[in-house]
Amino acid sequence: MIVLGIDPGSRRCGYGVVAREGARLTVVESGVLVPGDLPMAQRLGRILDGLDALIARARPAEASVEAVFSGASPRSALVLGQARGVALAAAARAGLPVFEYAPSEVKLAFTGNGRAGKDQMLRTARMLLGAAPGLSDEADALAIAVCHLARRAFAVPAAGAGRAAAARAAAARLRPSRRDHRGTP
C-alpha cells in the first residue's frame, strides 16, 4: 500500500509518500512544496498544482493530512485551514480517501512521544525510514503517512472516494475491549 502524508502550510507544504509491504516501510518520495513569496491565492494555486503532479506521479492509494492545531492564533488557524483545504481538495479530486490525525497522535505513532520536538521527528525519520529530510515539514509529512499506515486498520476516511460508509460500518462492528462504568460491554 502506498500512502501520501501531507503537512499543510501556505508557505511550506511538506509531503511524504511511503509504501508498506508487510512490515517494511519505504520512502517513495518526499519533499517540501515552496510556492514562493506570492499573494495567498497564487501560493495556494501552486501548492495545488504541486500536489496534483505528485499524486499523478506517485499514485498513492490513500492520503493522510495533519488536523488543524487549535493552539495557533486565529489568523494562523485561518491560513492553515486554507492550506489544508487545498490538500484535501487535491486528494479528493484524485479520488483518494483522506484521513486526518492530530499532531500529538502523529508524534506518538512515529516517535513514541506525543510531544516530540522537531529534532526528534527528524532523527526518527532518519532511523525508521532511512530518509534525510531537509526540513521539519518533510519529516512531519513522512510521520503523517507512517501514522496512517500504523492506524489504518481502524481509520475512518474524512473525505473522498466514497469509502467512508464502508469504513464507518466496519468501525461500528468493533467492540470495546473494556467495560463501561455500568459493567456492560
Swiss-Prot record:
Single GO MF descriptor: DNA binding
Cofactor(s) required, per the database record: Mg(2+)
Keywords attached to this entry: Cytoplasm, DNA damage, DNA recombination, DNA repair, DNA-binding, Endonuclease, Hydrolase, Magnesium, Metal-binding, Nuclease
One GO location term (cellular component): Holliday junction resolvase complex
Residues of the active site: D7, E66, D137
Cystines in this chain: none
Functional description taken from the UniProt entry: The RuvA-RuvB-RuvC complex processes Holliday junction (HJ) DNA during genetic recombination and DNA repair. Endonuclease that resolves HJ intermediates. Cleaves cruciform DNA by making single-stranded nicks across the HJ at symmetrical positions within the homologous arms, yielding a 5'-phosphate and a 3'-hydroxyl group; requires a central core of homology in the junction. The consensus cleavage sequence is 5'-(A/T)TT(C/G)-3'. Cleavage occurs on the 3'-side of the TT dinucleotide at the point of strand exchange.
EC annotation from Swiss-Prot or TrEMBL: 3.1.21.10
Lineage, highest ranks first: Bacteria, Pseudomonadati, Myxococcota, Myxococcia, Myxococcales
Residues that bind Mg(2+) 2: E66
Main localisation: cytoplasm
Record-stated family: Belongs to the RuvC family.
Catalytic activity: Endonucleolytic cleavage at a junction such as a reciprocal single-stranded crossover between two homologous DNA duplexes (Holliday junction)
GO biological process: DNA recombination; DNA repair
Gene that this sequence comes from: ruvC
Protein name: Crossover junction endodeoxyribonuclease RuvC
